[in-house]
Swiss-Prot record:
<dbReference type="GO" id="GO:0045746">
    <property type="term" value="P:negative regulation of Notch signaling pathway"/>
</dbReference>
<dbReference type="GO" id="GO:0007507">
    <property type="term" value="P:heart development"/>
</dbReference>
<feature type="region of interest" description="Disordered">
    <location>
        <begin position="269"/>
        <end position="294"/>
    </location>
</feature>
<feature type="modified residue" description="Phosphoserine">
    <location>
        <position position="23"/>
    </location>
</feature>
<dbReference type="GO" id="GO:0001525">
    <property type="term" value="P:angiogenesis"/>
</dbReference>
<dbReference type="GO" id="GO:0006511">
    <property type="term" value="P:ubiquitin-dependent protein catabolic process"/>
</dbReference>
<dbReference type="GO" id="GO:0051260">
    <property type="term" value="P:protein homooligomerization"/>
</dbReference>
<keyword id="KW-0539">Nucleus</keyword>
<dbReference type="InterPro" id="IPR011333">
    <property type="entry name" value="SKP1/BTB/POZ_sf"/>
</dbReference>
<comment type="pathway">
    <text>Protein modification; protein ubiquitination.</text>
</comment>
<dbReference type="InterPro" id="IPR003131">
    <property type="entry name" value="T1-type_BTB"/>
</dbReference>
<feature type="modified residue" description="N-acetylmethionine">
    <location>
        <position position="1"/>
    </location>
</feature>
<dbReference type="GO" id="GO:0031463">
    <property type="term" value="C:Cul3-RING ubiquitin ligase complex"/>
</dbReference>
<keyword id="KW-0833">Ubl conjugation pathway</keyword>
<feature type="short sequence motif" description="PCNA-binding">
    <location>
        <begin position="239"/>
        <end position="245"/>
    </location>
</feature>
<feature type="domain" description="BTB">
    <location>
        <begin position="32"/>
        <end position="100"/>
    </location>
</feature>
<dbReference type="GO" id="GO:0005112">
    <property type="term" value="F:Notch binding"/>
</dbReference>
Amino acid sequence: MEEMSGDSVVSSAVPAAATRTTSFKGASPSSKYVKLNVGGALYYTTMQTLTKQDTMLKAMFSGRMEVLTDSEGWILIDRCGKHFGTILNYLRDGGVPLPESRREIEELLAEAKYYLVQGLLEECQAALQNKDTYEPFCKVPVITSSKEEQRLIATSNKPAVKLLYNRSNNKYSYTSNSDDNMLKNIELFDKLSLRFNGRVLFIKDVIGDEICCWSFYGQGRKIAEVCCTSIVYATEKKQTKVEFPEARIYEETLNILLYEAQDGRGPDNALLEATGGAAGRSHHLDEDEERERERIERVRRIHIKRPDDRAHLHQ
């Protein structure tokens, strides 16, 4: 499986074992292609790109440094190949969009230092400084409308968790533990947002129609919902009960991480298929399998206790 990127090709093939060290001697630098194995990722690129800027790569391919080559002619570079395509794009174009993640910018900075790509190094350092100066550790938007919520979820490349809490929606009095449980739900949401903010979009909703409800989104659609409220009878009077289903909330949060993008390639469909996620399922299904898929793809709505089931119960 190979992916094209400009004048480079990247593959995950494994090189042959036999190697030798030589000084690189190339002809026709404007047209000659070079085969590179960077930490197991294979790239084709041109001499023109490699020697365009004054970097370690230019030194390697102008004969000033020795290079290690395997028996199939692949030049071996003992570095992680994850960001090498970005390095090549920068050498070719003179600029690249930087990753959003601080961790990935730091990884790219380390590669820029190794290859002595001064311009990219300075851009990464400036981006990290801006993040330190202007960006808080954790951002949690509080939505103002359903359209804003839809836009946030549709445009995010992360899975999303939304907590809706709105005490003003209650028509009855609360049970004795409801206020404490409401606070526990809010506190857990805050803890999860601090722990997973780099991987999950967390959203607060204080204008919705529920009293306390968690929603979980993957690939732009709702995957599961945990409703924490129910109506109970106490001394012949209806009351609203808020519960704190901590284990269920943790379970659905971990499930939603299956929809996390993998190095910009989208979620791991094999993992989704193995764990029952709808996105990983085959499109070639018979009628029974199709019905089962539709059942699974419906939103998992978990109500701690259903009001209908409790309509005739008295406490």
